[in-house]
Structures are given as C-alpha cells and as structure tokens.
C-alpha cells in the first residue's frame, strides 16, 4: 500500500466519526463506575451499598438480548425520520443527556433507591447506544480500515473516562453536585452533534423484515457463512485469545501489594504507566493493521501480549523498584492496547453488516466470559 493511500486511510472522515463514537460510548459508563461511586461516598453512603451498585452494569453484559430490535426497528421521532441506526443513536443520546443531569438533583441518603433505578436506566441506555454505535461503525468502515477505526474508537472510549473520572471530580470540590452532573451530561452533546451531522449508512445487505428474522437470521448467517466447524473454531478463538492476558492482570493490584509497593506507589505509577501505553499501543496497532492486515496482526500482537506477561515474573524475581514497576505495567498495557486493537477488528470483520447490531453484541458478550472466569479463578490457580 502506498503512502498516499495510507494517509487517506488515516486522515478521513470515517476516522473522525470513530473518535466521536468512542467518546460517546465511554462517557456514560465512566459516569457510572467513576463519578457516581465518588458522589455517593462523599454524601455519606456506606461502602456496602456502593458495592451493590456494581450490579447496575448488568445491561452491558446482557445487551445482546435486545440487540435484534436494533437491527429490525427504527424509532420514529415525530416528523423526523433519521433512519434505522441514527434513530436509535439520537433517542439514546437525548435520554442519556437528561438522565445523567437528573442524578445530581437527588439526595443519596433519602433517594438511594431512586438513584439506583436511574443508574440502571442509564446503563441500559448506554448499552443500547453501544450496540448501535458498534453497528454503525461496522457499516461505514471498509474491511481494511476496521483495525484503525476500531482502535481509534476504543482509545477515544478510554479517554472519555477522563471527563467523569477527573474533570468532574475536580469540579465537585468547587461546585454543588447538581451543577457537576449537568456539566458532565453536557459532554453527551458531542454524541448528539455527531448523530445530527452524519448520514444513515447505506447497506448492501437486506435488513431483517420481521423480529423473528432479526433473532434467527444472525445465527443462521454466521454458521452458513463460516460453516459449522469453522464457526465453532472462531468462537473458541474469541474465548481464548485474551484469556492469558485476563488471568495475568486479574490479581495485579494484590500482587503489587505483596511485592511491597505502597498503595500510593501503585496509584501514581499504575495510573500513568497503564493508560498512555495502552492508547499508544492501540493507535500503533491500528496503523500497523493497515499495512499487515488483521490476521497477521493477531499473531504478532498476540506474541507481544505473551512476552509482556513475562514482565510479572521478572518483577517477582527482582523485587521492589518503582522504575521496574512502571516498566512492567507500561509494557503489559502496550501489549493490551495492541492485542485489543487486533481483536476488536477481528470481531468486527466477523460480523455481517446486515446483522451488525446483534452479532457484534453477541460476540462482545462472549469475549467477556473468560475475563469474568479469570477474575474468579486466578486466585484459586495460584494456591
């Protein structure tokens, strides 16, 4: 591929759209996992109750259950007909704008259940927005741009966490919480601007015409395109590709503590040594995939993941040293960024654009299984 074509693949409108889709996806999630717990604790809510709030994340796991609706039905908005994908984007973003702003007007001590239900609603809307943004991205990106486009999306998703996780927390020291949540919800407007400024993707494939077809056809399409044996091999690959990485990082913080590092050391070093190498790895991986393709990237980046995990063994052998902790974490998350870039691109390529909402949601739910199992069983394996 010549350099002009490479520049065109990097510097185009589709990549700009991927920045906005990533930011729009990440914002609501980080409101729930970063800002809401800090708000509740500041207002005097107990750790037990705050811990139970993690259950509001269930819609992200089970989003595949209603994903066929997004492949079948569009939402009419009075006289405005934005189309199948954009109607869901616009509806979820408008509701997210309102519901996130509403949080700050409730008292955590006297309205905790109302807050819990409202947060569950935000999680449902956010998961639904994720479904449609994944589908939209799959439809607008040609296969050769899936790697870079999805890398940009994932990194913008992570950077979005700096708004509720950093900016909003800083503002809360100077402003009342109701203003903080209104300001935070204002960042949802970036997603709305995106939705209003883009066009509905053109589809070369026939969309399902009945709800039954929207549920059954994605499965039939996947197994008929790949063949039963190949389909099961692909699903097994999706389950296993990130398993080692998940197991290596599942108990990382307890491991650092056992090695003698203080919580301050871990907080300062881990935060800075993880985020930016992961972002650099994701962007570099996306650009490399334009040159080498997704299949070769899976092998190459997978090897980097394996080597980076060995850093934990080096840390265990050599022992304490902040420079070593930063080096090990940085290299590990560089591998995470590279591997995630290739893996998400592979998942996107495996989907059929006609059933992108359902298949993408199913595949991403499947890939969450080994991460959950790793978190639960890694400690047992070390006994």
Locations of regions flagged by a protein language model:
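Juxtamembrane intracellular "pre-TM" segments in multi-pass secondary transporters
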Residues: 2-11, 200-234
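C-terminal ends and interior cores of transmembrane alpha-helices
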Residues: 87-109, 303-320
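Loop-to-transmembrane helix entry/capping segments in MFS-fold secondary transporters
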Residues: 47-48, 143-152, 263-264, 353-363
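C-terminal transmembrane helical hairpin of 12-TM major facilitator-type secondary transporters
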Residues: 296-343
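Symmetry-related core transmembrane helices of the 12-TM Major Facilitator Superfamily/SLC fold
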Residues: 91-97, 179-197
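Helix-to-loop junctions at the C-terminal end of transmembrane segments
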Residues: 63-82, 280-297, 382-383
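Glycine-rich segments within core transmembrane alpha-helices of 12-TM secondary carriers
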Residues: 60-63, 147-172, 364-375
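Helix-loop boundary and gating motifs at the non-cytosolic
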Residues: 2-60, 232-237, 241-255, 259, ...
């Amino acid at each position: 591929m010549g350099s002009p074509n490479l520049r065109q693949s990097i510097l185009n409108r589709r990549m700009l759209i991927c920045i906005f889709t990533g930011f729009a996806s990440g914002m609501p999630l980080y409101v729930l996992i970063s800002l809401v717990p800090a708000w509740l604790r500041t207002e005097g809510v107990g750790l037990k109750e705050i811990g139970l709030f993690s259950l509001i994340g269930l819609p992200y796991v089970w989003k595949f259950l209603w994903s066929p609706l997004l492949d079948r039905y569009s939402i009419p908005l009075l006289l405005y007909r934005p189309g199948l994908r954009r109607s869901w984007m616009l509806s979820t973003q408008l509701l997210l704008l309102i519901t996130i702003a509403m949080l700050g007007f409730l008292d955590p001590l006297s309205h905790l259940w109302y807050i819990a239900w409202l947060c569950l609603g935000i999680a449902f809307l956010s998961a639904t927005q994720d479904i449609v943004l994944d589908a939209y991205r799959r439809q607008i990106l040609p296969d050769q741009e899936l790697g870079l486009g999805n890398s940009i999306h994932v990194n913008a998703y992570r950077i979005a966490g700096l708004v509720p996780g950093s900016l909003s927390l800083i503002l809360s020291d100077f402003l009342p919480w109701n203003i903080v949540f209104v300001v935070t919800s204002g960042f949802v407007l970036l997603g709305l601007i995106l939705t209003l400024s883009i066009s509905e993707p053109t589809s070369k494939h026939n969309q399902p015409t009945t709800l039954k077809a929207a549920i059954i056809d994605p499965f039939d399409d996947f197994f008929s395109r790949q063949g039963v044996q190949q389909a099961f091999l692909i699903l097994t690959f999706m389950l296993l590709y990130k398993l080692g990485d998940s197991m290596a990082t599942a108990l990382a913080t307890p491991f650092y503590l056992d090695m003698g590092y203080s919580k301050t050391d871990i907080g300062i070093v881990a935060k800075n040594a993880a985020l930016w190498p992961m972002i650099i790895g994701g962007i570099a991986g996306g650009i490399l995939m334009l040159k080498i393709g997704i299949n070769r990237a899976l092998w190459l980046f997978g090897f980097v993941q394996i080597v980076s995990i060995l850093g934990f063994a080096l840390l265990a052998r050599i022992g304490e040293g902040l420079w070593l902790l930063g080096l090990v974490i940085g290299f590990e998350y560089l591998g995470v960024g590279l591997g995630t870039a290739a893996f998400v691109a592979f998942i996107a390529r495996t989907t059929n654009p006609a059933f992108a909402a359902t298949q993408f949601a199913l595949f991403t739910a499947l890939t969450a299984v080994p991460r959950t199992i790793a978190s639960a069983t890694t400690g047992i394996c070390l006994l």
